[in-house]
């Protein structure tokens, strides 16, 4: 039931899919997190190699394309502990999208 609800919600963003897959994936992950925040396990995840954000909800991982593999993802709140310089770069370039 939850998976159907999530996929139905994601489908509403079909026209913005390209944007959320190429540069704004953090913001779509936040949309999903806030929309499905009633689930305690709902959290933002990050793939260090692919530089991609997604949301873990009810044990499954989602981005704007639907359910995706969890391989290579780590909890976003753990990235700072993993590599503080990488964390700062991600915030600057991918979340805030600051000009250099």
Model-derived features with residue positions:
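A structural boundary/capping signal
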Residues: 1-100
């Amino acid at each position: 039931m939850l998976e159907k609800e999530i996929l139905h919600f994601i489908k509403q963003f079909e026209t913005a899919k390209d944007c959320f897959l190429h540069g704004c994936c953090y913001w779509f992950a936040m949309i999903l997190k806030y929309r499905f925040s009633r689930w305690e396990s709902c959290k933002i995840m990050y793939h260090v190699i692919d530089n991609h954000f997604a949301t873990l909800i009810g044990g499954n991982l989602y981005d704007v394309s639907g359910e995706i593999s969890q391989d290579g993802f780590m909890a976003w709140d753990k990235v700072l502990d993993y590599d503080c310089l990488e964390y700062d770069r991600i915030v600057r370039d991918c979340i805030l999208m600051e000009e250099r």
